[in-house]
Amino acid sequence: MAIKPAYVKKTGTLLMERYPDAFGADFEHNKDVVEELTNIESKGVRNRIAGYVTRKMNNPVEA
């Protein structure tokens, strides 16, 4: 598994802090939320951020 770029982590973390109730464990839902809350035009970047947020929502505790 690859390490996510800093801009994906930074944007994802910022969105989760500002809108904690907007995200869930479903990738498709998170993808739509990221599209609504940001001005990111790139589909690939949007999906990477949504995937990062989904992964964090499914596994909130880090060891």
UniProtKB/Swiss-Prot annotation:
SUPFAM superfamilies: Rps17e-like. The keyword Ribonucleoprotein applies. InterPro entries: Ribosomal_eS17, Ribosomal_eS17_CS, Ribosomal_eS17_sf. One of its GO terms (cellular component) is ribonucleoprotein complex. Keywords: Ribonucleoprotein, Ribosomal protein. GO terms for molecular function: structural constituent of ribosome. It comes from the Archaea. PROSITE patterns: RIBOSOMAL_S17E (PS00712). Pfam families: Ribosomal_S17e. One of its GO terms (biological process) is translation. Belongs to the eukaryotic ribosomal protein eS17 family. NCBIfam families: PRK01151.1. This is Small ribosomal subunit protein eS17. It comes from Haloarcula marismortui (strain ATCC 43049 / DSM 3752 / JCM 8966 / VKM B-1809).
